[in-house]
């Protein structure tokens, strides 16, 4: 093990198998916090390869608590975080729009690592229980079409790195591979990433992990979401191939806004923003969700273009269907908890 760690310290790439070996040591609690921190920072400085990302993602999935759901029907739209944008919870809001379109959404997420409010924080503020049993998550996916999968709950072995990640206060490979490790077997996925240089590589990794279709995007301002502030870069994985594209908000009939227009706050403030969007309140928050939900619908294959996705997302919010998904999730969750 020391030899493998030294390879990373010496800026040498690891094979997929070597990374799996180190990850297994971490997830079984056999590496000290000091060594984990040194490893993560050395890997960050060196730069993570597709082989390394796939290796650690597979190791995480092997020790995850599995959530049963028909293979190939659910999707996720969580991002890596770590973009330092301090935006509101865009992907969490968009998830209710995707669910309203009839797409089962297994929303994988965590508490805040490098922002004021993570998806788990805002979900709790909305009244969503983030510690449901796996069978309850399955029930909600079947009955409502959306369930929140709290990362530390479904990945209990991540307890060995949580304190280290929080103390480092900077994105690591775990930000990159977190969205790759959903315990539900996904067929499609939208994944935002804070590093534009890893778009193609990450799309390839999603293919290696069994996705049939996926979009990996990096927004203007290097956000891990699609942004109204300028040009968005994204990679589309389909049929074993990756193609790179760009898209500006004007391309799909949306107005440009500066990044400051979508600044969020703490969990309470972000929950209020989420509700305002689902209520259809016009402005930068709504348009940002329309763009991101549009990308999600496109990634799923529900629509043929992002433009069609934006139009459908607008209809789903105007009709009240997206807002109803939030209400249904809370209602059926109470039913589960009452058993």
UniProtKB/Swiss-Prot annotation:
Domain of life (superkingdom): Bacteria
Cofactors: Mg(2+)
GO MF, one annotated term: magnesium ion binding
Gene Ontology BP terms: L-tryptophan biosynthetic process
Associated pathway: Amino-acid biosynthesis; L-tryptophan biosynthesis; L-tryptophan from chorismate: step 2/5
Residues annotated to bind 5-phospho-alpha-D-ribose 1-diphosphate: 79, 82-83, 87, 89-92, 107-115, 119
Catalytic activity: N-(5-phospho-beta-D-ribosyl)anthranilate + diphosphate = 5-phospho-alpha-D-ribose 1-diphosphate + anthranilate
Top-level enzyme category: transferase
EC number in record: 2.4.2.18
Positions contributing to Mg(2+) 1 binding: 91, 225
Protein keywords: Amino-acid biosynthesis, Aromatic amino acid biosynthesis, Glycosyltransferase, Magnesium, Metal-binding, Transferase, Tryptophan biosynthesis
Binding positions for anthranilate 2 per the UniProt entry: 165
Record: residues binding anthranilate 1: 79, 110
Binding-site positions, Mg(2+) 2: 224-225
Gene Ontology cellular component list: cytosol
Manner of cofactor binding, per the entry note: Binds 2 magnesium ions per monomer.
Keyword Plastid appears in the UniProt entry: no
One protein family per Pfam: Glycos_transf_3
Record-linked NCBIfam families: trpD (TIGR01245)
PANTHER family named among the record's database cross-references: ANTHRANILATE PHOSPHORIBOSYLTRANSFERASE (PTHR43285:SF2)
Complex formation: Homodimer.
Protein role: Catalyzes the transfer of the phosphoribosyl group of 5-phosphorylribose-1-pyrophosphate (PRPP) to anthranilate to yield N-(5'-phosphoribosyl)-anthranilate (PRA).
Annotated family: Belongs to the anthranilate phosphoribosyltransferase family.
Full protein name: Anthranilate phosphoribosyltransferase
């Amino acid at each position: 093990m020391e030899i493998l760690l030294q390879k990373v310290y010496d800026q040498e790439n690891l094979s997929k198998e070597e990374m799996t070996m180190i990850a297994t040591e971490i997830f079984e609690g056999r590496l000290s916090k000091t060594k984990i921190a040194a490893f993560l920072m050395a890997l960050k400085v060196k730069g993570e390869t597709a082989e390394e990302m796939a290796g650690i993602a597979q190791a995480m999935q092997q020790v995850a608590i599995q959530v049963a759901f028909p293979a190939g029907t659910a999707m996720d739209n969580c991002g890596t975080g770590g973009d330092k944008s301090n935006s509101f919870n865009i992907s969490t809001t968009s998830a209710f729009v995707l669910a309203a379109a009839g797409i089962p959404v297994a929303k994988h997420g965590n508490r805040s690592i490098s922002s004021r409010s993570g998806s788990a924080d805002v979900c709790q503020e909305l009244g969503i229980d983030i510690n449901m049993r796996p069978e309850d998550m399955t029930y909600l996916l079947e009955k409502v079409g959306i369930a929140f999968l709290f990362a530390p709950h479904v990945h209990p072995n991540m307890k060995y790195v949580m304190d280290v990640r929080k103390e480092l206060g900077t994105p690591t490979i775990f930000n990159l591979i977190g969205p790759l490790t959903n315990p539900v077997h996904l067929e499609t996925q939208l994944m935002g990433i804070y590093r534009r240089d890893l778009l193609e590589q990450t799309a390839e990794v999603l293919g290696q992990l069994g996705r049939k279709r996926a979009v990996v995007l990096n927004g203007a301002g290097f956000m891990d979401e699609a942004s109204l502030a300028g040009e968005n870069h994204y990679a589309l994985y389909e049929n074993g191939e990756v193609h790179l594209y760009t898209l500006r908000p004007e391309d799909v009939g949306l107005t440009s806004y500066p990044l400051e227009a979508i600044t969020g706050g703490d969990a309470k403030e972000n929950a209020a923003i989420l509700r305002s969007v689902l209520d259809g309140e016009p402005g930068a928050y709504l348009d940002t969700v329309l763009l991101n939900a549009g990308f999600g619908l496109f990634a799923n294959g529900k629509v043929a273009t992002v433009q069609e996705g934006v139009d459908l997302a607008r209809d789903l919010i105007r009709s009240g269907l997206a807002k109803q998904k939030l209400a249904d999730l809370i209602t059926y969750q109470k039913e589960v908890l009452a058993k």
